[in-house]
Amino acid sequence: GWGGDTSWLRQRAHPDEAKLFAAEDEAQQRMIEDSVGKGLSRDVLPLKPTFVTIKFGMNDHSYQKFRPDIFKAYTRSQSQLQKVLSGAGARVSFLTPQPIEEKRADPDQDVRNQSLRKFSDGLKQVAQERGAGFVDQFDPYMAIMMKERASDPKAFIGGGDAVHPGPAGQTIMAWAVLKGLGATAPVSSASITLPAGGVETHGCKVGKVAVSGGGVSFDRLDESLPFPVDERAEAALKIAPILEDLSRYELGVSGLAAGTYEVLIDGESVLKTDAEALKKGVNLSNNAGPITKQARELLGEVFKKNNSFFHRWRDVQLYSFPGWAQGAETEARRSAELKKLDEEVVARAIEVLK
């Protein structure tokens, strides 16, 4: 969204915010209904969504200690968002904000984080009342921050800045969100027993098993790729159980003689390990090699698709022309550009699905 967006779908610098917070119940509700209705009608409802995640709170709490007047506007706005979206046929899941990550040893004592925690608790209550989904990013992110600060008071887990995490922090957020939405860990697994070459599989097909020279070779065709991790975010894997919780791309081989073994995919080395580890099973989700390369190529296509939509929305649909340039001809050109960009987004989405 725009920098500074809030759950009532206006930027926090809007001149009427003080009026909104001070308004009596009915007046405040009318203001929220008007603002939310306009925003969703412009940006969301035309897309005919079937499932919508909503994440507000960081800007809403206004970067200060807890204020009941802002909190009331926040919970009312979230409720109104769900009401409008569900009325249009969409399922809704609310996501809490992540904590603010200042470089201090006790981020849980930051009054802004204490406020965000209260906002998150209020959001959970809204979700329960409205029958919506709810995902808590705040607690898992805070738990990792506290753990890292305990060993290094200067640890900074998110990258980016205190409010805008970089790729590592975004990946931790994605982990918390996907877990909260019920994503499961298994991608695929193949377990081979030597010397007979018996095979057990999940999510893949294995054939042409050949046992020779103390090792084994086979063909494996997976139904899906493992969870792609942005190379800029690999630090997140060291501090959160992301692959364990979301991406188990596994290989097991039992019956090997004791010793060290090399795992190769399409002739490319992806792991060196021992017989005991292979017997237990190894997770190859983010090991360098052809599978990770494919997953990252897919992630790159997702980025391209998302960037195309962002450009379409922010740079074209929301672009505000100066008064002298406004008019029917300008809007016709805008509509033509939106049509062209819609086609581009669809084309990129098709590339993702290939």
Predicted stretch roles:
Residues 12-16:
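Short, surface-exposed amphipathic charged segments that create phosphate/polyanion-binding patches used
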Residues 17-354:
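Alpha-helical cap/lid subdomain in secreted, periplasmic
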Residues 1-8:
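A short beta-strand-loop structural module common to alpha/beta enzyme folds
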